[in-house]
Amino acid sequence: IETPERNGGHYDYFYNGSGVAIVDINNDGLADVFFAGNDTPNKLFLNEGDFKFQDISNNAGVESVNWATGVSVVDINEDGWMDIYVCNSGPTVDDNLLANQLYINNGDLTFTEMGAKYGIDDTSYSSQAVFFDMDKDGDLDLFVMNHSSINYEKNVHKWEEVLLNKPTRIREKSFSTLYRNNGNGTFDDITKESGLYRPGFGLGVAVSDFDENGFLDIYVANDYFIPDFMYFNQGNGTFIEDIQSKVSHSSFFSMGCDAADINNDGLVDLAVLDMTPSDHYRNKTLMESMDVNKFSYLTNQKGYVPQYMFNTLNLNRSKGHFSEIGHFLGVAQTDWSWAALLVDFDNNSWKDLIVTNGFKRDTRNRDWMNELNVRYETEGVTGAILYDQLQKSNSTPITNYIFKNRGNLKFDDASKEWGFNEPSFSQGAAYGDLDNDGDLDVVINNLESEAFIYRNNTMDRKSNHYIQFV
């Protein structure tokens, strides 16, 4: 809820929206749906079959006053019931509101919050988390991707200086966290000794074995000028960041990402989203030209990998060396994009690509920014002026994208054909077989409007066979 004291001018990610998870919480064989909420309680819907869902949020004990962002599901205590881990962030400095939450499934449609007990109630500004077995010891460790609240995008030369001069408590919130599972119901923060201690603006994370050494690596998609991180697992509890030698370039305003094999060669590829419109008018009115001086400083003086403002799709050539082919595939420009999902929706054995997008305020509009600057010069820099200008900004919902993978590195925009035709401000997305018919359905979390639930009709039209594991 925007107010003069609390809006996109006070918190850069005010309009970023929330995630969604699909998980069977009561072991009845039907996948249920959990929605994280910004400025609104989380919601848990029980699947009653035939695409009918019951809201059990209040009785389940998963509603909260926190600003929830990403959501992950895991059976953290190995009792056979899926638990829910919620990342929190928002326009606040209150650690009680920032603390991530772990909802332990009691097996009776209720949950108990136990983040602090497990030692994973991270109080940074968290975007998403992923559970994975970092050290191949048979239990799941946890990587929590955080983002800095200190944005000096306009003056990148001073950002690190400003960050380092902040009090330790504030500075540490700019770093993501790696937790090692001790196997006894507790986790330890091993970020510094593992080699992951780097500040950033994490908005997307993907975990996979990119270099084929048998250990899971971590890719972090960073917003603004900080380059994406590609952490390669050394198999001894440490990681080496080495994106510079693995890709020719990356996205600039990196958002969501996903890892999957798009050409069925057995190697894991990587999609990363940015915010460049495909529409010529929006491209010219909303996007700045590349800043040559900034680009030169970041690449030549800082040594960052070159970053460009478009989606990237990196084809794995082996051992984690990638060729970027986003433009070649026609997936490079999808507007202000958020979630990327690489998954086979039409059961043809090729991974398709879903992209959610939309941003509530066109705050990158050149005319709007010029008018704001004029008002600042003539009336002074105040929150009241910014709030007034925000109310005058365009609010343009746009449609999401789905690209059909035809094989042989050919993607077609199938958005309209497959039913993605309603404009929205969409962020989090998840897939799962909600009706157990052998194809994957999609749930999308929208900002300030009802969610989208897409029923996949593939199996109504095909005679494919499938195997279901229960």
Show the residue positions of the predicted features.
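Acidic, glycine/proline-rich Ca2+-coordinating loop motifs
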Residues: 1-470
